[in-house]
Regions:
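Short beta-strand/loop motif that positions the catalytic acidic residue
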Residues: 55-57, 62-68
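Acidic catalytic loop of the alpha/beta-hydrolase fold
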Residues: 66-71, 99-102
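Active-site nucleophile elbow and catalytic-triad environment of alpha/beta-hydrolase enzymes
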Residues: 35-52, 58
Length: 170
C-alpha cells in the first residue's frame, strides 16, 4: 500500500473542509454529516485508514508534507506514525515543503512553479483582473510554461516506490 497525503476518514475530510468554510460552526453540523454518511454508505461510513492498516498484513509506504494545506498532516500521517512507527511493515516519508499537490515533484519544479506563479501574477496585474479571460490564461501557459520543467517528477521518489513494490512481490 502506498498512501500519498490521504485523509484517515471521510468524516475527517468533511470536518476539515467545513472548518475552513464555517469555522467552529462545523461542530454543530457534524452530527448531521455523520448521519448523512451512514445513510448513504452504511457500514462503510465508519471505516478509517488507521483501523484498516491495523488489520492489514501488507507493507505500507506513507508520504505526506508538513505544509499540506488541503489535508493537514496531523489528520493522517501523524496518526499513522504514532501507531506504526516501530512496525517494520511501515515506511514513513515526511516532507516539509511539498504541499499537497507536489509530493511527487522535484525541488526544481517547486522553484520553477513559484517563478511561473510570480510571472502569472504580474501578467494578470498588467491586463487587469476585470478583463482577464480563460483564453488569456491558456495563452499565457502556452507561451510561458515549459511543461517538462513544470511537471518533472522527483526520480528518487519514483525509484523508491518501484523498489517498495518490487520488495513486496519478492
Amino acid at each position: 500500500i502506498i498512501s500519498v497525503a490521504g485523509f484517515n476518514s471521510s468524516l475527517d475530510m468533511i470536518e476539515n473542509v467545513g472548518r475552513d468554510m464555517a469555522g467552529a460552526a462545523i461542530d454543530y453540523a457534524m452530527p448531521l454529516f455523520e448521519d448523512l454518511e451512514k445513510d448513504k454508505f452504511g457500514d462503510f461510513a465508519t471505516m478509517n485508514v488507521l483501523e484498516s492498516l491495523e488489520r492489514s498484513t501488507a507493507d505500507v509506504l506513507i508520504y505526506h508534507s508538513a505544509d499540506d494545506d488541503m489535508i493537514p498532516i496531523e489528520l493522517s500521517y501523524d496518526k499513522y506514525y504514532e501507531k506504526f512507527a516501530d512496525n517494520e511493515r511501515f515506511t514513513f516519508v515526511r516532507f516539509e515543503d511539498r504541499g499537497h499537490n507536489y509530493i511527487f515533484n522535484s525541488a526544481d519544479v517547486l522553484k520553477y512553479r513559484d517563478e511561473v506563479e510570480a510571472e502569472y501574477d504580474e501578467y494578470c496585474k498588467e491586463i487587469g483582473e476585470f478583463y482577464f479571460t480563460g483564453e488569456m490564461h491558456t495563452e499565457f501557459v502556452k507561451e510561458n510554461v515549459d511543461k517538462m520543467k513544470f511537471f518533472k517528477l522527483d526520480s528518487e521518489i519514483m525509484k523508491q516506490m518501484v523498489e517498495f513494490y518490487d520488495n513486496c512481490i519478492e
